Curated annotation (Swiss-Prot):
One of the GO biological process terms: negative regulation of DNA-templated transcription
Descriptive protein name: Transcriptional repressor NrdR
InterPro entries tied to this protein: ATP-cone_dom, NrdR-like_N, RNR_NrdR-like
ZnF segments: unnamed: 3-34
Cofactor dependence: Zn(2+)
Family: Belongs to the NrdR family.
Swiss-Prot/TrEMBL keywords: ATP-binding, DNA-binding, Metal-binding, Nucleotide-binding, Repressor, Transcription, Transcription regulation, Zinc, Zinc-finger
Length: 159
């Protein structure tokens, strides 16, 4: 690795430690030329699949949109941040673990609905109203009946 101080190509690793989360490695390096020390961090480069939108366009996966979707649905709901983060992490793991290069926005939306269903039924209904483009009160009533008639500990809605 190039030294940030003198630009020399030759540096050596003095110490390596895994972070508390285990997601990155901290390395202390020393330049062979100027002998100054510096720290680098090594992380895994995650390649998410491209998202195929309903209109057929392909876009890069944007995790901020995922966070925003959860934040809007859960606005002023009594759901701990840790539970929300865990739900988002499960979706990210599904995306990474899918092994596909492209995935439909519909699939991601269904995963979000499943997670929201487990977290908070009101948030689930909020998200469903936008995601499924509710047009009248009857659409809301149908989803509310679905939520009320399903088992309390169910894994989620039937799609």
């Amino acid at each position: 690795m190039r030294c940030p101080f003198c630009g020399a190509e030759d540096t050596s690793v003095v110490d390596s430690r895994i972070s508390e989360e285990g997601a990155r490695i901290r390395r202390r390096r020393r330049c062979v030329e100027c002998e100054k020390r510096f720290t680098t961090y090594e992380t895994v480069e995650l390649r998410f699949p491209q998202v195929i939108k309903q209109d057929g366009n392909r876009v890069e996966f944007n995790r901020e949109k995922l966070y925003t979707s959860f934040a809007r649905a859960l606005h002023k709901r009594p759901v701990p941040t840790g539970q929300v983060d865990a739900a988002i992490e499960r979706i990210l793991q599904k995306l990474l673990g899918s092994g596909v290069q492209e995935i439909s926005s519909r699939t991601i939306g269904e995963w979000v609905m499943q997670e929201l269903y487990s977290l908070d039924k009101v948030a689930y209904i909020r998200f469903a109203s936008v995601y499924r483009s509710f047009e009248d009160v009857g659409d809301f009533q149908e989803v509310i009946r679905e939520v009320q008639s399903s088992p309390q500990n169910g894994d989620g809605p039937s799609s």
